[in-house]
């Protein structure tokens, strides 16, 4: 983790050299990382699209085998195999930003320059957001991002809990980490919007 933090720090310093503000540098840094993750995102969205398409079939299986969990699980996995769907295939792109989050947190805590780096209303990117604006944005953007890819209404409560959890976590983290998370969420929301729009366009043409 220390090695990753060191390289991330070097990349951030390189960006800061050109933009002149660490807050802006974190935003540019985040966009750069998200662009690198685009191939994984496309794979994730393709998998989620397939999951959404077979959701009516899954609901039929629940009605048919709802009283037999073991049979339901077997038939569901059989359906996934027939449709060539890996239900866990979309997890990696969701985890990669989190994997970067901890080294970034370490970097923000160990780089002395960040303790005096200001951005907008924040006097230090190594400290918590004093007005809780970043945690609120983290909560809202996390919910919007997860709600856009939800396959059924039953996931809404889970999305709310996850969003509140991320908001609470962001309260305890340096503002710089929160800026990274909010920027990452906004980038993902835009990605999902474009993907969904393109999918509808293709359906209309077919």
Swiss-Prot record:
State if Protease is listed as a keyword.
Answer: no
| GO cellular component annotations of the record | plasma membrane
List all membrane-crossing ranges.
22-42, 88-108, 130-150, 160-180
Q: Which UniProt keywords apply?
A: Cell membrane, Chaperone, Membrane, Protein transport, Transmembrane, Transmembrane helix, Transport
Q: Which GO terms describe its biological process?
A: protein insertion into membrane; protein transport
Would the keyword Mitochondrion be found if you checked this record's keyword annotation? no
Superkingdom assignment: Bacteria
Q: Name any one GO molecular function.
A: membrane insertase activity
Q: State the membrane topology.
A: Multi-pass membrane protein
Location in or out of the cell? Cell membrane
The function of this protein is: Required for the insertion and/or proper folding and/or complex formation of integral membrane proteins into the membrane. Involved in integration of membrane proteins that insert both dependently and independently of the Sec translocase complex, as well as at least some lipoproteins. Aids folding of multispanning membrane proteins.
The similarity comment for this entry is: Belongs to the OXA1/ALB3/YidC family. Type 1 subfamily.
What name does the UniProt record give this protein?
A: Membrane protein insertase YidC
State the species of origin.
Answer: Caldanaerobacter subterraneus subsp. tengcongensis (strain DSM 15242 / JCM 11007 / NBRC 100824 / MB4) (Thermoanaerobacter tengcongensis)
Its encoding gene is what?
Answer: yidC
